[in-house]
């Protein structure tokens, strides 16, 4: 199986051409045309414009991935003790690390990290197609952040970008992290970018 599904087409243009392209691509790969993480407004539009053509199911296995932003930003409580430990190790190794929003001035460094991240996994032939398409998607998202209404942040340590995160609002109350990349060999890098991105979004959009 190539993947579990695809995302709902972005933008405000007509849906039919985009859905036709997704359906043709799925047929080429011999997999069902499945869209994931459909929001209520997206479902309403699909039902309105394509009545009876889509079946909708709850994905209960994915519910664990919806978190309260305060929980991610503050990491309080016993259950998150291990995450705090990872961050403590990171702080010890990189006492002068900093978080920066992704801008035109530093986006090239994020692209460099993505290329290094993908190159380190290049030998995995079984997942080569998925890895390639993911890399293309990340690069496109970084280049088109403004057009896609995405927000991004990065972690800089020892004058090098070692982690970044990209996401967007799917509803006024829900921010979806689309991509989160870090050097896995650096303990705490993923945990720190996850926490700092949550803090950044919470501070920028307090309502």
Give each language-model segment a name.
Residues 52-126:
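Acyltransferase donor/substrate-recognition loop-hinge adjacent to the catalytic core
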Residues 21-25, 89, 116, 141-144, ...:
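A generic secondary-structure signal
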Residues 140-204:
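Glycine/small-residue-rich hydrophobic helix-like segments
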Residues 105, 109-160:
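Short, conserved active-site entrance elements at the starts or edges of catalytic domains
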Residues 1-41, 156-185:
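Conserved donor-binding loop and adjoining core beta-sheet/short helix segment
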Residues 31-49, 60-63:
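Short, glycine/charge-rich beta-strand/loop segments that flank catalytic centers
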Residues 32-38, 66, 98-103, 154:
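A structural signal for short, well-ordered beta-strand segments and their strand-loop junctions
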Residues 93, 202-207:
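Short, intrinsically disordered, charge-balanced linker/junction segments flanking boundaries
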